[in-house]
Curated annotation (Swiss-Prot):
Binds 1 potassium ion per subunit. One of its GO terms (biological process) is tRNA methylation. It is an enzyme of class 3 (hydrolase). The gene is mnmE. Residues 227-393 form the TrmE-type G domain. CDD domains: trmE (cd04164), TrmE_N (cd14858). Exhibits a very high intrinsic GTPase hydrolysis rate. Involved in the addition of a carboxymethylaminomethyl (cmnm) group at the wobble position (U34) of certain tRNAs, forming tRNA-cmnm(5)s(2)U34. The keyword Ribosomal protein does not apply. (6S)-5-formyl-5,6,7,8-tetrahydrofolate binds at residues 30, 92, 132, 470. Keywords: Cytoplasm, GTP-binding, Hydrolase, Magnesium, Metal-binding, Nucleotide-binding, Potassium, tRNA processing. This is tRNA modification GTPase MnmE. K(+) binds at residues 237, 256, 258, 261. InterPro entries: G_TrmE, GTP-bd, GTP-bd_TrmE_N, GTPase_MnmE, MnmE_dom2, MnmE_helical, P-loop_NTPase, Small_GTP-bd.
Length: 470
């Protein structure tokens, strides 16, 4: 990685804070590049004896092109490179939030010579190119911004603090040590003592196992990062909408005693034990002549196909019916599912239990109800939450320390595969130089994770997924 700022011909600018009409007390317009200070001095009028000193906040006004009209009252901060986020000269203009003030300030900045609008993720990309961040830290910042739960934010912060970088760099250095031993034997075997191939191979196997464990852990971490989609399915009037409202802690869906009340797919975003979950209340699935209701049923099938887990709700007071069995058969075999008996409050628990056993019998291939609950009273709610998290493997994600994103997972897996090929070369007693081929590939893959071995074209593709202003 480069440790001194890379010269960029253009200075970039963008709004670095979320902006919505009428929302937000303040917003930040960020500039980075060689003209940042000049542009800041041009658009911001600083009264009195205040001096433009690095890392000192100044008070002033953004003026229009004529210098007569005040566009906004602002605070401005100059950060001279390399002591800035990007490693370049950076100016941040803190103006009032909302829409119009921010837009006018940004337009005033972009009207200056040698300034253009920043591309998505371009500030972070410059930080990586200038050695202020490694690639895993930059990606972790993006994940921190997008985090939908406290646990996801904590996991992202570990990456921001360099947790992923340290882990990957340590593994890569261990491989580099082994590669240096091998290459020395290839070039100067006569001058060196014999190499213990078994010991070297054991070290490569240890690194491979650690990489495979990182990939396995990361798959569980995806649950915290991406969340789960849980589809509530069942016949009309079994209490799906009541269950959605219960879990959402608000009246998200209309609830009546009339079958077919829900005619579209309703969604509710919640967080359960640190896991972001999208609850999808589907229209009751049944045969119908109502075109509007049928449209809702079609969308229910689409929601089911996109779900991570299906919660099939049936009415305990009516028992398991042929329609329930038909719905169960429509759930894809590879989709995790839970059978949930609702309306347990309508009869004593002992009656509900006996009704469950008697009604299910062999009609569901020996499967029993996973949870009995009452969406009305909340009875069984905690059991349902635990069952959903366990079914999706989310419970196992709670203890993770670091979790690779998908790009990092793919590269770690590629490194592990390359090390497996190295082991095959050893088993076939191939010469040392055959070992080095795949070992170099593993080292290269790990270098791509941290950005030590990566092209700017690949960086462009990675950072294009970031938000503008980051």
């Amino acid at each position: 990685m480069m440790s001194s700022p890379i010269p960029h011909q253009q200075t970039i600018a963008a709004v670095a804070t979320a902006v919505a009409p009428g929302q937000g007390g303040i917003a930040v317009v960020r500039l980075s590049g060689p003209a940042a200070e000049v542009v800041g001095r041009s658009v911001v009028s600083i009264p009195g004896q205040q001096l433009w000193v690095s890392h000192r906040v100044l008070y002033g006004h953004v003026m229009d092109e004529s210098g007569k009209e005040r566009i906004d009252e602002v605070l401005v901060l100059l950060m001279k490179g390399p002591r800035s986020f990007t490693g370049e000269d950076v100016v941040e203009i803190h103006c009032h939030g909302g829409l119009m003030a921010v837009q006018r300030v940004l337009e005033r900045v972009l009207a200056q010579p040698h300034v253009r609008r920043a591309l998505p993720g371009e500030f972070s990309q410059r930080a990586v190119l200038n050695g202020r961040l490694d690639l895993t830290q930059a990606e972790a910042i993006s994940e921190l911004v997008a985090a939908r739960s406290r646990r996801a934010a904590q996991l992202a912060m570990t990456g921001v603090d360099g947790g992923i970088q340290r882990r990957i760099t340590s593994l890569r250095e261990r491989l580099l040590d082994q590669l240096s031993e091998l290459e020395a034997r290839v070039d100067f075997e006569e001058d060196l003592p014999p190499l213990d191939g078994a010991e070297l191979l054991l070290e490569l196997q240890c690194v491979r196992r650690e990489l495979e464990q990182l990939v396995e852990d990361a798959k569980r971490g995806d649950v915290l990062r991406q969340g789960l989609q849980v589809a509530l399915v069942g016949r009309p009037n079994v209490g799906k909408s009541s269950l959605l409202n219960r879990l959402s802690r608000r009246e998200r869906a209309i609830v009546t005693d009339l079958p077919g009340t829900t005619r579209d797919v309703l969604e509710s975003e919640i967080v359960l034990e640190g896991v972001p979950i999208t609850l999808v209340d589907t229209a009751g699935i049944r045969a119908t002549q109502d075109a509007l209701e049928q449209l809702g049923i079609d969308r229910s099938h689409q929601a089911l196909a996109a779900a991570d887990v299906a919660v099939l709700v049936f009415d305990l007071s009516l028992g398991w019916t042929a329609d329930d069995a038909a719905l169960l058969a429509q759930i894809p075999d590879d989709l995790p599912r839970l059978l949930v008996g609702n309306k347990a409050d309508l009869q004593p628990a002992s009656m509900a239990a006996s009704l469950m056993v008697a009604s299910l019998g062999n009609e569901v291939d020996g499967k029993t109800v996973d949870v009995m609950l009452s969406a009305l009273t909340g009875q069984g709610e905690e059991a349902l939450i635990k069952a959903v998290l366990k079914t999706c493997g989310a419970s196992e994600a709670q203890g993770l320390v670091v979790a690779l994103n998908q790009r990092q997972q793919d590269l770690a897996a590629a490194a592990a595969i390359a090390l497996a090929r190295t082991q095959e070369a050893a088993e076939h007693q191939l010469p040392w130089d055959f070992w080095t081929i795949d070992l170099r590939q593993a080292i290269s893959s790990l270098g791509e994770i941290t950005g030590e071995e990566i092209t700017e074209a690949v960086l462009d593709r990675i950072f294009s997924r970031f938000c503008i202003g980051k």
